[in-house]
Amino acid sequence: MINNVVLVGRLTKDPDLRYTASGSAVATFTLAVNRNFTNQNGDREADFINCVIWRKPAETMANYARKGTLLGVVGRIQTRNYENQQGQRVYVTEVVCENFQLLESRSASEQRGTGGGSFNNNENGYQSQNRSFGNNNASSGFNNNNNSFNPSSSQSQNNNGMPDFDKDSDPFGGSGSSIDISDDDLPF
């Protein structure tokens, strides 16, 4: 049997971190995941998916992820039920996350703002960040414009928004000065 889930979306609010009676950390959160198609008005709708994550990853998520943060999560679907105070049986379907990845830097999150606004708006979804993710169109992603690497050419010609480096340039070379990285920019 296979029960695998991979989601990319934005947090609708800060993760809710709690601890069980035995001391295990558990965080619940909701991801807004854009659909791959638009509705009749041309807007991209979103699905709001309830998720739960346990132990150390839950604490890490609570420390680093905020409302509007772009996340990738890997997990499994779980269905559970309980009886509410009115005696009714309530069924809950959620994604139990085994791992997550922050998909943008903290500075990118802060430049975007607090993530307010409608998640149905295409500008707030992951599609505007990376239009090739989840798109099965052969003209997107790494196959853009059918360009191939030609070592004899001095520059690659592409239209995918990536910088063009010739074979002799060193994109990591610089003035020899040190890099100033804030602790807030590190994911650990």
UniProtKB/Swiss-Prot annotation:
<dbReference type="GO" id="GO:0009295">
    <property type="term" value="C:nucleoid"/>
</dbReference>
<keyword id="KW-0227">DNA damage</keyword>
<protein>
    <recommendedName>
        <fullName>Single-stranded DNA-binding protein</fullName>
    </recommendedName>
</protein>
<dbReference type="InterPro" id="IPR012340">
    <property type="entry name" value="NA-bd_OB-fold"/>
</dbReference>
<keyword id="KW-0238">DNA-binding</keyword>
<feature type="region of interest" description="Disordered">
    <location>
        <begin position="106"/>
        <end position="188"/>
    </location>
</feature>
<dbReference type="GO" id="GO:0006260">
    <property type="term" value="P:DNA replication"/>
</dbReference>
<dbReference type="InterPro" id="IPR000424">
    <property type="entry name" value="Primosome_PriB/ssb"/>
</dbReference>
<feature type="compositionally biased region" description="Polar residues">
    <location>
        <begin position="119"/>
        <end position="129"/>
    </location>
</feature>
<comment type="subunit">
    <text>Homotetramer.</text>
</comment>
<feature type="compositionally biased region" description="Low complexity">
    <location>
        <begin position="130"/>
        <end position="163"/>
    </location>
</feature>
<keyword id="KW-0234">DNA repair</keyword>
<dbReference type="GO" id="GO:0003697">
    <property type="term" value="F:single-stranded DNA binding"/>
</dbReference>
<keyword id="KW-0233">DNA recombination</keyword>
<dbReference type="GO" id="GO:0006310">
    <property type="term" value="P:DNA recombination"/>
</dbReference>
<keyword id="KW-0235">DNA replication</keyword>
<feature type="short sequence motif" description="Important for interaction with partner proteins">
    <location>
        <begin position="183"/>
        <end position="188"/>
    </location>
</feature>
<dbReference type="InterPro" id="IPR011344">
    <property type="entry name" value="ssDNA-bd"/>
</dbReference>
<dbReference type="GO" id="GO:0006281">
    <property type="term" value="P:DNA repair"/>
</dbReference>
<comment type="function">
    <text>Plays an important role in DNA replication, recombination and repair. Binds to ssDNA and to an array of partner proteins to recruit them to their sites of action during DNA metabolism.</text>
</comment>
<feature type="domain" description="SSB">
    <location>
        <begin position="1"/>
        <end position="104"/>
    </location>
</feature>
<dbReference type="Pfam" id="PF00436">
    <property type="entry name" value="SSB"/>
</dbReference>
